[in-house]
């Protein structure tokens, strides 16, 4: 839902801008009308909590309905400079990225077996774009997760139904903590977007950012070339 108006007022009084995620144009408009400064249009491809509308459809819908009431950032399925260029072409003011940084060299969560990538990163590096599922098992609300033995267990015919939010998170939080320290990549229970299929090596954040810039420039040059022919 939208942030409470009194919280927005307190943040604004302290000079702090307020951002909120939206999975539909309806949610985005509600955010903008109560004073949210930045609406993050998060498409179906994204990791974690997502709606059912893909970014290519959602972002321009949100841009159109919000108008000039708030800035719009695109999220979901963005991990390269080409995708940044596409998001801006759809009308977004910028992008909101998360999954692409999970395989950064600076990422420091999860067990390590030999001083190399964490077990979490090993699981992410091995995944394809088809290796995610959208389930309620993480928090009680639909969230995109890495497919694993954990998600398979919840998909079994004899598995219980997830509890409503926030009870599901209370139920599984201890299990998530244990799995985060496991040395078995097949048990990793990690929110991640479909972009995981392109996350195939460990790189410093500086290199990730440099490739975003160079990829964006290459994409826009290509468009310029197309226009000039």
What are these regions (language model features)?
Residues 52, 57-73, 79-229:
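Conserved active-site-proximal phosphate/metal-binding subdomains
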Residues 1-73, 80-99:
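Alpha/beta enzyme core
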């Amino acid at each position: 839902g939208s942030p409470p108006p009194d919280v927005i007022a307190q943040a604004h009084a302290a000079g702090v801008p307020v951002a909120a995620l939206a999975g539909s144009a309806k949610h985005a408009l509600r955010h903008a009308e109560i004073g949210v400064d930045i609406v993050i249009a998060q498409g179906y491809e994204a990791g974690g909590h997502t709606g059912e509308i893909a970014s290519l459809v959602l972002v321009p819908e949100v841009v159109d309905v919000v108008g000039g009431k708030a800035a719009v950032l695109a999220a979901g399925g963005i991990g390269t400079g080409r995708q940044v260029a596409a998001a801006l072409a759809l009308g977004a003011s910028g992008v909101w990225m998360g999954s692409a940084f999970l395989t950064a060299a600076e990422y420091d969560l999860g067990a390590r077996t030999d001083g190399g990538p964490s077990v979490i990163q090993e699981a992410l590096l091995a995944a394809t774009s088809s290796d995610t599922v959208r389930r309620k098992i993480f928090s009680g609300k639909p969230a995109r997760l890495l497919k694993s033995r954990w998600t398979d267990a919840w998909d079994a015919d004899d598995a219980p139904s997830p509890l409503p939010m926030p009870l599901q998170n209370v139920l599984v939080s201890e299990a998530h903590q244990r799995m985060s320290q496991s040395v078995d990549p097949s048990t990793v229970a990690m929110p991640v977007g479909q972009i995981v299929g392109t996350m195939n090596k460990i790189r410093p954040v500086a290199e990730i950012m440099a490739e975003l810039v160079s990829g964006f420039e290459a994409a826009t040059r290509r468009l310029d070339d197309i226009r000039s022919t």
